[in-house]
Swiss-Prot record:
Annotated residues for binding of ATP: A53, Q54, T55, G56, T57, G58, K59, T60
Broad class of the protein's primary localization: cytoplasm
Name of encoding gene: rhlB
GO cellular component annotations of the record: cytosol
Protein name: ATP-dependent RNA helicase RhlB
Motif (Q motif) on chain: 9-37
CDD domains: DEADc, SF2_C_DEAD
Subunit structure and binding partners: Component of the RNA degradosome, which is a multiprotein complex involved in RNA processing and mRNA degradation.
Region named Disordered: 396-415
Function noted in UniProt: DEAD-box RNA helicase involved in RNA degradation. Has RNA-dependent ATPase activity and unwinds double-stranded RNA.
Chain ranges of the Helicase ATP-binding domain: 40-219
Length: 415
């Protein structure tokens, strides 16, 4: 981590439950990020907080630290049953829920608190088996949580801590009714520690906090610019005919260690995947049509370095912390300005630098004006020589012929 990303405040400065400090220290977390330094004094005192911070700022560790400390320093409800978790962490997507659960595992192992997962699309019986054994902290998405609650596999009446992560995304995906349904089955707000985190503290997010939290303190961590000052942005204007060749040429020139390519539709993502896989790249595909088991395998391979490139729709643009992503390519400029910020926020995280390259083609160039207005600056434009683009590229693979990719082969440019 870069020192400029951290504050002078140390985790050891707080009166944290000792095993928590030991885990943080073993993982190299000594100094707090701004969102951690600003929220922990409030949450560790048992007071509610609504925090605004972009992804990659350390908010997950902020609420996990507070959650574990609170449970370890406060007794469970008297007469608590096996199906009654003590803490509930709600996330908008299953990928984010899995990520939070993974981040919490070292703390769980060190403290003896039991973790559970509840998300749709996969593993119903496997998740249920863990819940039936009893969990202290339950991480999940609203649909599966409601399912388990309605069948009395989970009872929310002994909840002591509630975390709502990516609250603005919850609104975008239409989950707010589900969240309110779950809140109504918990103890009153005054009897819980409530934490909410969001990329924006809009009126609707503040209204949610007012309804279901107890005089929450609002904490805002604004970046120097919405896109992050460690991200180098670049923009090209390709024709539709040259767009794919330009992408492949840029990948060849940049040779990114680990990159994510975003496109606006699953069909476009499949097309990109086919071209790159045929060209020998170690590339994975992440869209809504990919099964949950395969999505998790792809993310694991990408995180561990078995894949160099991930082609994705915006399903992967929020919440996922994949370390050391060096490049983000916007093959299509997004229709939603916020999606641009969230996409390129996959790189330049936790004090690292990153590179974002966008292609403003004939189809999506009209989105650029709104994006630049939203981020508050113009994206630097670069030019390319059409004659220098790669030409002897293989025909794209069909999606049904998924393979991990063969060794890259040498190519020549014309001239």
């Amino acid at each position: 981590m870069s020192k400029t990303h951290l504050t002078e405040k140390k985790f050891s400065d707080f009166a944290l439950y000792p095993p928590i400090v030991e885990v943080l220290d073993s993982k190299g977390f000594n100094n707090c990020t701004p969102i951690q330094a600003l929220t922990l004094p409030t949450t560790l005192a048992g007071k509610d907080v609504a925090g605004q911070a972009q992804t990659g700022t350390g908010k997950t560790l902020a609420f996990l630290t507070a959650t574990f400390h609170h449970l370890l320093t406060h007794p469970a409800a008297e007469g608590r049953q096996t199906n009654q978790p003590r803490a509930l962490i709600m996330a908008p997507t299953r990928e984010l829920a899995v990520q939070i659960h993974s981040d919490a595992e070292p703390l769980a192992q060190a403290t003896g608190l039991k973790m559970g997962l509840a998300y749709g699309g996969d593993g119903y019986d496997k998740q249920l088996k863990v819940l039936e054994a009893g969990v202290d902290i339950l991480v999940g998405t609203t649909g599966r949580l409601i399912d388990y609650t309605k069948q009395n596999y989970v009872n929310m009446s002994a909840i002591q801590v509630v975390v709502l992560d990516e609250a603005d995304r919850m609104f975008d995906l239409g989950f707010i009714k589900d969240i309110r349904w779950l809140f109504r089955r918990m103890p009153a707000a005054a009897g819980r520690l409530n934490m909410l985190f969001s990329a924006t503290l809009s009126y609707r997010v503040r209204e949610l906090a007012f309804e279901h939290m107890n005089n929450a303190e609002y904490v805002e961590v604004e970046p120097l610019q919405k896109t992050g000052h460690r991200i180098q942005e670049e923009l090209f204007y390709p024709s539709n005919e040259e767009k794919m060749r330009l992408l492949q040429t840029l990948i060849e020139e940049e040779w990114p260690d680990r990159c994510i390519i975003f496109a606006n539709t699953k069909h476009r993502c499949e097309d990109i995947w086919g071209h790159l896989a045929a060209d020998g790249h170690r590339v994975g595909l992440l869209t809504g049509d990919v099964s949950q088991k395969r999505r998790l395998r792809i993310l694991e391979k990408f995180t561990q370095g078995a894949l160099d490139i991930l082609v994705a729709t915006d399903v992967a643009a929020r919440g996922l912390h994949i370390p050391s992503v060096t490049h983000v390519f916007n093959y299509d400029l997004p229709d939603d300005c916020e999606d641009y910020v969230h996409r390129i926020g996959r790189t330049g995280r936790a004090g690292e630098s990153g590179c974002s390259i966008s292609l403003a083609c004939e189809e999506y160039a009209l989105n650029l004006t709104a994006i630049e207005s939203y981020i508050g600056h113009q994206i630097p434009v670069s030019k390319y020589n059409s004659d220098a683009l790669l030409t002897d590229l293989p025909a794209p693979k069909r999606l049904t012929r998924r393979r991990s990719g063969a060794p890259r082969h040498n190519r020549k440019r014309p001239g």
